[in-house]
Amino acid sequence: MKLMIIESPGKIEKLSTILGDGWKIAASVGHVRDLPQKEMGVAAPDFKPSYELTERGEGVVAKLKNLLKQADSVYLATDPDREGEAISWHLQQCLKLSNPLRVTFNEITANAVKASLVAPRTIDVKRVAAQEARRVLDRLVGYMVSPELSRLTGKRLSAGRVQSPAVRLVVEREREIKAFKVTNHFGAMLFFADAKTSGEWSAEWLTKPKFVAEDNPYFMDRDFAAAVAQVKAVVVKSFDESEAKRSPPPPFTTSTMQQAASVTLGVDPKAAMDAAQKLYEQGHITYHRTDNPNVSDESLGDIYAVSVKLGLDIAEKPRKFKAPAGAQVGHPAVTPTHWEVEEAGETSDQKALYKLIRLRAIACQLADARYAVRTVRLEAAQPVGGKNVEFEARGRTLIYQGWLKLIAGDQTEEEDGNEKESSNPIPVCAPGECLDVARGKLLEKKTKPPSHYTQATLVKKLESEGIGRPATYAAIMDNIVSRGYVKTEKKYLFPTETGELIVDSLVGKFEFLDLGFTREIEESLDRIAQGESGYKAVIAKVHDQLNMELSTLQVSATPKHPCQECGKPLRRIPGKNGHFWGCSGYPDCSVTFPDEGGKPGQKKPVEVSNFACVKCGNPLKHLVKKGKGGYDFWGCSGFKEGCKATYEDKKGKPNFEKAK
């Protein structure tokens, strides 16, 4: 018997059908080993990780050991990325495999699977080292920084090497929006009647460069703009006709697939990845964790065949798209495995995502869309306020659909600016021609703040900043929302009070919050995978940096809200009657403070009477609570010093005869 070990049990049925008799397919169900849960699991100077079987891994490994007794050969067919390579290495270690055959395939089809069996290889230890470095770096930041973060804030909070920079982006965008000051400015639009078509076209006043500067592009004089809108006639200065092309977007990478699923289907990155995982396991799409925006060369023939069948024109030569900076391009873009299949998947999300993937992948090799473009420059026949004013009209008409015959545009964009551009049907004009203005309009404009991030646009930002990798985006989104650092309202992301507290506590104190540092770490991991850097050097550098920052912080930093009694951080605690602040040193320190606008307030001074305690001489306090469970008695203000004396109330005075 030949044993093939894969990651996901969802692939077993499909692979069993492909491989047939003589094969046993078993799943590791992800990682079987990890760093220990209750300790760091790695330490200087060698930073060698200490792994232990996960609770699920113990059962998986026991089952696999039994299967090994019947196996003649073992094929490790975990996923074709760094994570999959690491899982294969851990399986080799746990099962004590002396000569496992490592095979990978980018799609679960008979051709791809059988081709991989013909050319097995050994485990790529450089890629394993890169994954191990990522895991250890995440552990270092989490275990070294989180306790200090909790000390500073008085709350049990966690810091993350990638999640914290993601939260920072959301926090800074929110503050940018709140700090934004609206600028009211003005423009003018002229409208012209086209006698031949009975239509209307428009031209906008050009305020640059005569009326505004590059560093302050807003025209503020409303009266002058209104006068421009009253222009009655213009002279044509120039008229130009040209043709513009619009190329199709590339096929999906992991991040663009998540963005398109969010924008077009309304599903979050995690749901998109879950649907893609199922489609991959069912054999409908290629491997969906990739940053390569190009289809495989072998797919071109299939794309051309489907395009001809659909009556679509293909591009003159195969298209190649530029990969993002730092992309690993280890696997082709996300595409269908059987291009002629129009519908695939078991659920509505899977079917909708498959359709997006297929049409986008076909469109990438279709001909450009073409537009007829007309541009006319106009000048007012008479100066306005002694100044010559010019206008420009630009119109675009689709004359050849090309790839737009198949898909409407780039589904990753929240708003497709190209499609918003008006056709503006400008007639043929001759330089020197005088045109009458049908009507004018004063444009009252105002600047807009940047939009809040959505999960789609945050993924796009993370990718552009080089933060994270295809396999991590969905987990980042899920973590920052599920842990309460970011919340979603009508698809937009807002920081929570906790998220802002984390960012304020870490920024300026730890370098891993800087986007540039996070990007450098990703590049270091890439170099480890390529054999250009060593694991130990990368880990030691980050470890030393964190140690230095923690030492500096512990010497200089004080808690944001220190206890006035012991100096430990105060914590904001929900109570029956709202929030209050208590000392994190409880029960050793039981000081509390009222909550005032999310911050510790001042305790009201204790109101004492002129009556003295007969036991210790301290002033008495009149303690009254009305309603259910109420009370009315006198107590000693020396309670904390040990005097427990109480007195019954007698007509608003302590009854010294009834002392307890």
Swiss-Prot record:
CDD domains in alphabetical order: TOP1Ac, TOPRIM_TopoIA_TopoI
Reaction it catalyzes: ATP-independent breakage of single-stranded DNA, followed by passage and rejoining
Interaction with DNA, as annotated region: 158-163
GO molecular function, one term: DNA topoisomerase type I (single strand cut, ATP-independent) activity
Keywords: DNA-binding, Isomerase, Magnesium, Metal-binding, Plasmid, Repeat, Topoisomerase, Zinc, Zinc-finger
Site feature location: Interaction with DNA: 31, 134-135, 138, 143, 289, 483
UniProt-annotated catalytic positions: 287
GO annotation terms (biological process): DNA topological change
Stretches annotated zinc finger (C4-type): 563-589, 613-643
EC code: 5.6.2.1
Toprim domain span: 1-110
Function summary: Releases the supercoiling and torsional tension of DNA, which is introduced during the DNA replication and transcription, by transiently cleaving and rejoining one strand of the DNA duplex. Introduces a single-strand break via transesterification at a target site in duplex DNA. The scissile phosphodiester is attacked by the catalytic tyrosine of the enzyme, resulting in the formation of a DNA-(5'-phosphotyrosyl)-enzyme intermediate and the expulsion of a 3'-OH DNA strand. The free DNA strand then undergoes passage around the unbroken strand, thus removing DNA supercoils.
Family label: Belongs to the type IA topoisomerase family.
Protein name: DNA topoisomerase I, plasmid
Organism of this sequence: Xylella fastidiosa (strain 9a5c)
